[in-house]
Structure formats: structure tokens, C-alpha cells
């Protein structure tokens, strides 16, 4: 299932939903780290900006998983950060979710 298709099916988020989303976002974050660390990376600054933007969402999900809950406000903020990342940098819509 595609990343945003999965997110759009969630009415009331659970910690299990957050774990699934976290796994996909974390894979994207790891890919960005690899690209930034490539020798003679011409796009180093771009990859670092990508990582900083995505890190906000990742940190929110970690906090929710640690607290074993997500409030409606946290969910809306998380969705805002994820969609903002997609608009600014792209690449998330091609992620697949493993259930």
C-alpha cells in the first residue's frame, strides 16, 4: 500500500498506526543520510535540509510511541509536517507501507 493511501485510511490513529508510519519515514531518513554522506555529494546541503524537515516528524512519532498514545492535536501536527515535507521535497508518495 502506498504511504499516503495508508495515512488517508486512518480515522483515529493508534500507536500501531504510528509504528507503521515511523518505519516508512525512518527508511526514507536512512536513505537521505546515505545520500548526504556520499563522497563529493553535490547536493549535501539539500539532503541535510531534507533530513531536518523529516526529523521533526520522526521525533514526534518517537515521543508518541514512548508515551504509548497520540492526541488529536499531535496527529494533526504530524500530518502537517508529513504533508509539508512532501510539498517541499517530495519522495514520500512513492514509499510503500508494510502491514
Where are these regions (language model features)?
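N-terminal acidic leader/helix
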Residues: 3-30
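Acidic, low-complexity, intrinsically disordered interaction modules
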Residues: 27-93, 97
